[in-house]
């Protein structure tokens, strides 16, 4: 081989190919802003929740847990929504899921869960026999499994999904007091449970989802692009559940396989997120979100699985050559 210029170009092309993510490979990035409705300075010193006269820049990424770039958006799946808020004090990541609970509480069960979501390669789809064997062996996974196999697992629009932070955060105020917090992003115009007037929960029927998978596999991404082009910018209200840290020793509130009781800890409307422009793919793929990437006034609740998840996000970014 003597055409060295051709060889050089070939290696350059191969070097430009991005290394794929382990999970959430198919995604789309956006930019926008976040503004709070009221100050939460009695709970946290984080400026993003204290300064009412400011709008904070935001970068966000919508994605799907299973599959790759060619996977249909309406395939039964768990969707992801990661938001990075920029302030003068630091950066704050809010990593959310389309389901309010997860399958496991212990990090040592992760590899077995991963095997149940491996048909040919890691996290390419649900291996149904392995998956249901996993659920039988780990009954705490049933809650998440039932939600996944309901209409909540079939979505054709990122704009219409309710997003939940499965990982618990800690708010720290100026007095040194601590509060446990879980977030949820609700599409603007819905109530705290994601319901519109008439109590019709937004979801897709399986037959419609199957049709859309063949008709337009990029339905969710196209929906975002169309909305931005028409000026119907996606908007989500942030709701927070706040718990005194004294409850942290109670087993029920340590598990991510159950939701917090809303009668005891009612969600409070906190602010509005509006996404106003699409981000080029080469820029959004250089982002690495992590549940522990937080600034002053907020920290990650340091249980075993949260620490593992934070490490996994950062290690995945390092493997792709990007950092938080």
Report residues per predicted region.
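Active-site-adjacent core segments of small-molecule enzymes
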Residues: 1-324
């Amino acid at each position: 081989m003597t055409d060295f210029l051709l060889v050089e170009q070939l290696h350059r092309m191969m070097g430009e190919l991005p290394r794929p993510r382990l999970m959430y490979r198919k995604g789309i990035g956006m930019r926008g802003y976040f503004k709070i409705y009221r100050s939460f300075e009695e709970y946290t010193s984080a400026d993003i929740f204290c300064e009412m006269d400011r709008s904070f820049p935001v970068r966000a990424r919508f994605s799907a847990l299973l599959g790759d770039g060619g996977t249909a958006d309406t395939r039964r799946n768990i969707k992801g929504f990661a938001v990075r808020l920029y302030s003068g004090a630091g950066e704050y990541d809010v990593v959310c899921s389309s389901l309010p609970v997860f399958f496991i509480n212990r990090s040592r069960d992760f590899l077995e869960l991963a095997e149940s979501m491996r048909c040919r390669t890691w996290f390419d789809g649900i291996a149904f026999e392995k998956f249901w064997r996993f659920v039988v062996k780990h009954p705490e996974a049933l809650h998440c499994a039932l939600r996944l196999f309901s209409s909540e697992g079939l979505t054709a629009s990122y704009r219409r999904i309710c997003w939940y932070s499965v990982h618990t955060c800690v708010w720290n105020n100026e007095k040194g007091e601590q509060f446990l917090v879980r977030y949820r992003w609700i599409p603007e115009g819905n109530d705290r449970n994601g319901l519109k007037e008439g109590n019709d929960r937004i979801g897709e029927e399986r037959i419609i989802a199957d049709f859309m998978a063949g008709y337009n596999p990029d339905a969710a991404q196209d929906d975002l692009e169309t909305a931005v082009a028409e000026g119907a910018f996606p908007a989500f209200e942030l709701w927070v559940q706040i718990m005194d840290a004294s409850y942290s020793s109670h087993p029920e509130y340590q598990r991510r396989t159950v939701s917090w009781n809303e009668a005891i800890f009612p969600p409070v409307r906190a602010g509005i997120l509006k996404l106003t422009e699409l981000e080029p793919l080469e820029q959004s793929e250089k982002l690495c979100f992590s549940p522990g990437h937080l600034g002053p006034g907020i920290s990650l609740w340091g249980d075993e699985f949260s620490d593992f998840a934070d490490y996994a996000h950062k290690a995945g970014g390092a493997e792709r050559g990007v950092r938080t």
